[in-house]
Amino acid sequence: MATEVAARLRGARISAQKARLVADQVRGLEVEKALNLLEFSPKKAAKIVKKVLESAIANAENNDGADVDELKVSTVFVDEGMTMKRIRPRAKGRADRILKRTCHITVKVSEGQE
C-alpha cells in the first residue's frame, strides 16, 4: 500500500531550468540518500529542494504516520511560475528587460516497495 504525500513550494526565486537539474538527481531515491545528496550539492536549487523534501517527509510522518526509513522520493517536478519583469537602463536612453523567473517545486514521497 503506497500512499503518496506531497509538499509544494510556489514562487521559488530560481528559474525552473536550474531547479530541474537538481530535481532530476533526487527522483526515485530513498529519502535518506536524497537528503544527503542535496546537503552536499553546491547548487542554490539544492537548498530549496531540500527544504521541500523535508516538508514532504514531515507531512508523511505527522499526517499519515509513515515510517521515515521506508520513504522514497516517488515524484519531483518543477513548473514555471510567474516571471517578474524589471528594467536595466542602458546607454543613449535605451533599456533592457530583465526577467526574474520563479518556479513551483512539488515533491511527493511514498512508502512502499515498488
UniProtKB/Swiss-Prot annotation:
A GO biological process of this protein is: translation
Which protein is depicted?
Large ribosomal subunit protein uL22
Which Gene3D superfamilies does this one have? Ribosomal protein L22/L17
Q: How does it assemble?
A: Part of the 50S ribosomal subunit.
Q: Which family does it belong to?
A: Belongs to the universal ribosomal protein uL22 family.
Q: Which PANTHER family match?
A: CHLOROPLAST 50S RIBOSOMAL PROTEIN L22-RELATED (PTHR13501), LARGE RIBOSOMAL SUBUNIT PROTEIN UL22M (PTHR13501:SF8)
What gene codes for this chain? rplV
Give any Pfam family that matches.
Ribosomal_L22
Its biological purpose is as follows:
This protein binds specifically to 23S rRNA; its binding is stimulated by other ribosomal proteins, e.g. L4, L17, and L20. It is important during the early stages of 50S assembly. It makes multiple contacts with different domains of the 23S rRNA in the assembled 50S subunit and ribosome.
Q: Give an example GO cellular component term for this record.
A: cytosolic large ribosomal subunit
Keyword annotations for this protein, in alphabetical order, are: Ribonucleoprotein, Ribosomal protein, RNA-binding, rRNA-binding
